[in-house]
Amino acid sequence: MQKKIDLINGPILSSLTKLALPIMATSLIQMAYNMIDMIWIGRLGSSAVASVGAAGMYMWLSNGLVTLARMGGQVHVGDAVGAGRTDFAGRYAATTFQMTLLLGVLYGLVCTIFSKPLIAFFHLTSRSVINDAVSYLMITCGLVIFSFLNQIFTGLFTAIGNSHPAFLSTSVGLVINIILDPLLIFGIGPFPALKVTGAAIATIIAQMVVTLLFLFFASQDQILFHHIHLLQAPDSKKASEIFRLGLPSCLQSLVFTGISMTIARLVAGYGDAAVAVQKVGAQIESISWMTSDGFASAVNSFIAQNHGAGKEDRIHAGYRSALKIVLPWGLFCTILLVCFPTPIFKIFITEPDVIPMGISYLMILGFSQLFSSLEITTSGAFCGYGRTMPPSITGITLNLLRIPMALALTATPLALSGIWWSISITSILKGLILFIWFQITIKKK
C-alpha cells in the first residue's frame, strides 16, 4: 500500500501536488469514463443522448445526496488524522459508511419504484426516448450504492493523504467501461445489441469492479481502515457531527441539481435535440470543473489536516499554491472551448441540425471556465476549514438566479442561447464572490 503523503510537514507545493495529481488524474479518468459513454451513445443518435441526459440528471442528484456523508466524513477524518487521533478517525469513517449504505439503498429504491414519473418531469416528446430514459434510470440509479461507496472510499483515502487507490481503481473501471460499452450497446460478437440499456449495464459493472478494488486497497491499509468496524452500533453523536458539516454542501448540491433539472425542462421546450446538446456540452465542459473538483478535494484534506494540527500559516500558503495550478488550467479550458467548439462537439454528435446549438453552448459556457475553477477550489478550501456555509450560500443564491435570468433571456432574440448565458454569467459571479469572501475570512484569522 502506498505510504500516505505528509501534509502537515515539509514543502507545501510538492506535498499538495503529490496528493492532488492522482486525484486530478482520477477526475480526468472519470471525465473520460463519461465521455466514452457519450461518444458511443452519440452514435445511436441525438434521441439516445437525450434519454441518457434526462435520466442522468437523477444520477447527478444522487451525487448531491452522498455529499451529506462524504463531505462531513472526509473533513472529520482529515482533522482527526492531523491531530493524531486515528481511533477517532476510524469511528468517523465507520459512521460515514453506515450513513452511505442507508442513503444508497433508499435512493435506489425510490428511483426504481418511481422511474416513470421521475422521467415524466422533463416532458420529453418521443416515446422511445422516454422508454430508454426509464430503463437507464432504473439500472444506474437503482444500483447507485456502488457509485456512493466509490465516492466515500475516494474521500476517505484522500483524507489520510493517499490518493493512489482512487486513481488505480478508477483506471481499471475506465478500461472495463471502454471494453463493455461497444459490446453491449451495439451487440458485437455474442452480445445482444442493448443500445442505451447496454450503456447503463456497462457503467454498473465497471462501478462494481471499482468498489471491489477499493475494498482490496482498504484491506491493505494500516492507517485508517483497520480502525473501522461497520457492524458496531451507529454512533449518533458522530453521525450528527457529520450531518451538520455535510448538510450545507449537500443542500447546495441538491439545489444546484434541482435547478439544473428545471433548466433542462426549459431546454426540452426547444426539442429533444436541445436536451442532447446540453448533455453533451456538460460532459465536454467537465474537463474544467471535474479536474478542479479533484484538486479541491486535495485542498480540502490539506487544510483539514493542517487545521487539526494548528498550522494556519501552511493553510494560507497551500491555498495560494493550489490557485497557481488550477487557474492556468481553467484559462486553458476557456481558450479551448471558445476557440475550438466545432471540432470538439463533432466528436460526439455529427447531425448537421444539432451542431450549431452545440457550438453556441460551448462558446458561451467557455467564458466561465476560469471562474468556475476558482469557485470550486475556494469551496474546497472553505470546507477544509469546516466552514461549509459560505460556498453553500453563494452557490444556492446564484444558482437560483439562473431560472429567472434564463426566463428573461429566452424571451429575447437569444432564445435557447439565453439559457446558456444564464449559466455562464452566474458561474462567473460565483467564482468572484467566493474568492473575495475567502480573502476576507483568512485576513480575519
Can you describe what each PLM-predicted range is?
Residues M1-A20, V77-L143, F191-L247, I303-S368, ...:
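Short alpha-helical transmembrane segments in multi-pass integral membrane proteins
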Residues N9, L13-A32, I36, Y58-L65, ...:
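Residue-level signal for short hydrophobic patches within transmembrane helices
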Residues K18-D37, I139, G173, A206-V210, ...:
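Transmembrane helical elements of multi-pass membrane transporters/channels
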